Amino acid sequence: MQIKPPYLLFIGDATDKLSIKMAQSLADWRAELCVGELSVNGCTVSTGLNQCSICEAAKLGAKTFVLGFANSGGVLDKKWLPIISEAIENGMNIVSGLHDKLTNFDELVSLSQKHNTNLLDIRHPSTAFATGKGYKRKGKRLLTVGTDCSVGKMYTSLSLEKAMKEQNIDVDFRATGQCGILISGSGVAIDCVIADFISGAAESLSPDAEETHWDIIEGQGSLSHPAFAGVSLGLLHGSQPDALVICHALNRTHMRGLLHTSFPSIETTIELNIAAAKLTNPDVQVVGISVNTSSVSIEQGNEICERLSQTFGVPCVDPLRDGVDSIVANLC
């Protein structure tokens, strides 16, 4: 699947910053490939890119219109079809990371054929995967795992890959979600793989490699989240990680989207993930903690990270504020 830049990022009428993480990820990691963002009345969030209409984007050479939002259930609301159609009529390919397939909408299929554009449903793998086998693979693997969803697993993974490349370490980022796939250009949307084959898909994502090579595997969900723990567990087993980085966001009182649930501690998260990971790698270790401290001051964030580092005996950082060099040093 080839995704052609430049991109126009569509965030609709989003009011939740976390709901536009696909657009925000591109704005943060591939801003040079984006011509701007498009929102409509009622939208209260932004990626920080300039507002840009479809016509303006086409004049700037935009090749792909990215549906940069997500929602519970991954539904494509029909109210967006006229806007998507306008983008197609202006010669743009359409990229979606939603569960609802673009190709399920006959009017979009017909229009894209007429204008010789592509409908790219990047959340739907076309590859057939085997079941997981659990055989020991060569090379080294790190998996980011979280106390909850949307706590920075992808950002931490990308930060680690970038820092390791700057130190001339042989490393690859392995995307497991639609945002990561769009950023890296490859990967597997692991939450759309049939349950029996999740661990096998993860094995195929990080195959045998040189002994000094690191695969940084993007984590998904959380073992403590009732809705997504199954995906997290299959990914954990198939990734066969040598190292885990625990990702956490401050000041959450319940699991994302589930007001009736309690939020797990970092200690509980470590215990759950280590116990589960040992099924396919008995030597797995936690090598760092990544904390989103954006809800507190820099000084408070530093104090919290220092305290967590002392408590758990591994580096603790906010990747966006501190970088991840200390975790890389502990890893290598």
Curated annotation (Swiss-Prot):
Induction: Expression is up-regulated in the presence of D-glutamate. Transcriptionally regulated by DgcR. Disruption phenotype: The growth of the deletion mutant is significantly reduced with D-glutamate as the sole nitrogen source. InterPro entries: DgcN-like, DgcN-like_C, DgcN-like_N, P-loop_NTPase. Pfam families: DUF1611, DUF1611_N. Its EC number is 2.3.1.312. Gene3D superfamilies: NAD(P)-binding Rossmann-like Domain (3.40.50.720), P-loop containing nucleotide triphosphate hydrolases (3.40.50.300). Keywords: Transferase. It catalyses: D-glutamate + acetyl-CoA = N-acetyl-D-glutamate + CoA + H(+); D-aspartate + acetyl-CoA = N-acetyl-D-aspartate + CoA + H(+); D-glutamine + acetyl-CoA = N-acetyl-D-glutamine + CoA + H(+). Coiled coil: none annotated. Pathway: Amino-acid degradation. It comes from the Bacteria. Belongs to the N-acetyltransferase DgcN family. N-acetyltransferase involved in a deamination-independent D-glutamate degradation pathway, named the DgcN-DgcA pathway. Catalyzes the transfer of the acetyl moiety from acetyl-CoA to D-glutamate to generate N-acetyl-D-glutamate. Can also acetylate D-aspartate and D-glutamine, with lower efficiency. Has low activity with D-asparagine. Cannot use succinyl-CoA. NCBIfam families: DgcN. This is D-glutamate N-acetyltransferase. It comes from Pseudoalteromonas sp.
